[in-house]
């Protein structure tokens, strides 16, 4: 059973994007049965708005290229800071994103909540420690999601 999900939620309208599922025909038929009884109806106006905006796959690619141009410098800056300040100290590791909107950062066990609290004291807004986990319950208190998309490049440099 393999399902792949996608969404335009962070691409177009936060919380109002359209979603898609890629799976086998059998899985698709199964999920269609479930969704039929779980929702009153799809937001067809919103679907039309997205179809008209993107037009085709080339429209999606062009829009994503604009996103990349805006956020790539921010991700490169954060990557450089992490490399310069953290890598040699052995106090954390991270996954360099290949798309998406977050760095997955893993601090030493038991430190994530404290790191996020210290960042807040310094005036830096962070995603809550453990946010990738259900109910933010990270058993090791080590995972922080770094989202450099919101602040300006100048703010990130500070």
Describe the predicted segments one by one.
Residues 125:
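Residue-level detector of anion-binding/catalytic polar loops
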Residues 121, 136-158:
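PLP-dependent enzyme catalytic core of the Aspartate aminotransferase-like
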Residues 6, 20-22, 96, 102-106, ...:
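Short beta-strand segments
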Residues 3-72:
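Conserved core segment of the aminotransferase class I/II
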Residues 65-79, 91-106:
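Conserved glycine-rich beta-strand-loop-beta hairpin in the small C-terminal domain of fold type I
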Residues 7-9, 91-92, 130-135:
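Short, solvent-exposed loop/turn elements at beta->coil junctions and helix N-caps
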């Amino acid at each position: 059973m393999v399902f792949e999900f996608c969404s335009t939620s962070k691409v177009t309208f936060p919380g109002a994007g359209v979603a898609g599922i890629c799976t086998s025909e059998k899985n698709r038929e199964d999920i269609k049965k479930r969704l039929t009884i779980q929702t009153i109806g799809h937001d067809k106006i919103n679907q039309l708005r997205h179809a008209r905006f993107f037009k085709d796959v080339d429209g999606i690619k062009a829009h994503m290229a604009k996103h990349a141009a805006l956020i790539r410098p921010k991700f490169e800056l954060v990557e450089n800071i992490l490399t310069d300040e953290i890598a040699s100290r052995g106090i954390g590791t991270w996954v360099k994103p290949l798309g998406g909107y977050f760095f997955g950062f893993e601090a030493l066990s038991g430190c994530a909540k404290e790191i996020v609290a210290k960042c807040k004291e310094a005036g830096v807004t962070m995603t809550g420690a453990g946010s990738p986990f259900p109910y933010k319950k990270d058993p090791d208190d080590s995972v922080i999601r770094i989202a450099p998309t919101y602040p300006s490049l100048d703010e990130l440099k500070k």
